[in-house]
Amino acid sequence: MAPNAADKCPVMNNTGEKCPVMSSSTQSRGPRDIYTLEALSHFNREKIPERAVHAKGTGAYGEFEVTADISDICNIDMLLGVGKKTQCVTRFSTTGLERGSSDGVRDLKGMAVKFFTEQGDWDWVSLNFPFFFIRDPAKFPDMIHSQRRDPQTNLLNPNMTWDFVTKNPEALHMTLLQHSDFGTMFTWRTLSSYVGHAFKWVMPDGSFKYVHFFLASDRGPNFTDGSTAKVDPNDPDFATKDLFEAIERGDYPSWTANVQVVDPKDAPKLGFNILDLTKHWNLGTYPKGLDTIPSRPFGKLTLNRNVKDYFSEVEKLAFSPSNLVPGVEPSEDPILQARMFAYPDAQRYRLGIDHLKAPLRRKETACQHDLGPEFEKWLSQVTSEAWSHPHEDDYKFAREYYEVLPEFRSQEFQDRMVENLCKSIAPGPEELRKRVYDTFELVSSELARRLREGAEAIVAEKARPDSPSRAQPGQLRL
């Protein structure tokens, strides 16, 4: 009986070719099963290096719709025309730890969006806080290392963080926020994200405005009442699961896009440097002595489709704040300038030199243009002191955040932040603890006193001979 068509149909094997698969592995003269060799070769190379930061993540597809006319301040094609829609892909992530870490770790959270515009890809690379630990890019490697695992024990060691913070007071503002409940209470669907940096939106005549834009979750602030997420503490992927299952059942999360605008002539009058990433553009909460920079809603982002293949559609995603479109330009912010180099450089290492040819990056229209508006002189110049030097604002913004918490949230919210700080400070050696107290004395005498009393009480409790938590050999070191 002649073989039928199904019998003749070749099998796709690991070489990528359609041909019958042989099972013999070796002959007298050595290996000859090229399919086994190819399968082993593929297995040895199927993983790629994880991201240097933001390694743990998840993603989904969606669309962005313009909801308000902002043509008076904007000449970006994607944002011109109420009702205009643009497809996009979004990746959420933790920041400091490795790919297998928990979604709920006390850490910054990232939300990166790649918009597939008619003029190329435009990336919004954002964090869940509108400011950062540092303003000098030279400090970035040390800052990240201070929040990772101890190189000797491979355990998290808060002493490394406090050693960095006490030597770099511009990090105090971010440190206080991270140790409040804002540092842990979230789901990806309720996360708001901020680009942090000042960008320039440039008009056809060459004039521009400094802008800061952000995405506010339509589900409201994360746990407004200060409660914690109702999740299984043993599930490190609770936020990832929550996002995926919500989209699968049609409960699509959405965010409102907002922009804050500063005329370059007004920038020197604001009382702080808008290019300093350790400070935020005041929305009216704090600092009370500085002008409010109101936000203006202009669009809505909705995520409505899960990925089919996590590795190719999320793990291989490549974002960069340098992926811009005509009408938007970077500011002189030193951290932004450094990120525009570091992100593509990291992708060349992680994904290879041809990462720009990945399917998610391909568009029917070219991504390189000569359409950008030009201008020859500054309308105003924002100048800065040496970025590495401490400044009174480093303490002022941290002080005002501490003082506004009972009004902004609740006294219990502030108390929990102090408790979290005390637990983090207490394992350190006496010399480091004293340095922490002295540093916070420059922020607030009341806060320094509460930290000293709380942390030293924990130290005394652990030193008791009958204490179950008494420090054992191999305790956290500096």
UniProtKB/Swiss-Prot annotation:
Source organism superkingdom: Eukaryota
Active site: 54
E.C. number: 1.11.-.-
Binding site for heme: 343
Reported cofactor(s): heme
Region (Disordered): 459-478
SUPFAM superfamilies assigned to the protein according to its UniProt record, in alphabetical order: Heme-dependent catalase-like
Pathway: Alkaloid biosynthesis; ergot alkaloid biosynthesis
PROSITE patterns with a match to the protein in the record: CATALASE_1, CATALASE_2, CATALASE_3
Keywords: Alkaloid metabolism, Heme, Hydrogen peroxide, Iron, Metal-binding, Oxidoreductase, Peroxidase
Pfam families in UniProt: Catalase
GO biological process terms, semicolon-separated: hydrogen peroxide catabolic process; indole alkaloid biosynthetic process; response to hydrogen peroxide
GO CC terms in record: mitochondrion; peroxisome
Gene Ontology molecular function terms on file: catalase activity; heme binding; metal ion binding
PANTHER family with a match to the protein in the record: CATALASE (PTHR11465:SF9)
Task of the protein: Catalase; part of the gene cluster that mediates the biosynthesis of fungal ergot alkaloid. DmaW catalyzes the first step of ergot alkaloid biosynthesis by condensing dimethylallyl diphosphate (DMAP) and tryptophan to form 4-dimethylallyl-L-tryptophan. The second step is catalyzed by the methyltransferase easF that methylates 4-dimethylallyl-L-tryptophan in the presence of S-adenosyl-L-methionine, resulting in the formation of 4-dimethylallyl-L-abrine.
Family named by the database record: Belongs to the catalase family.
Protein name per its UniProtKB record: Catalase easC
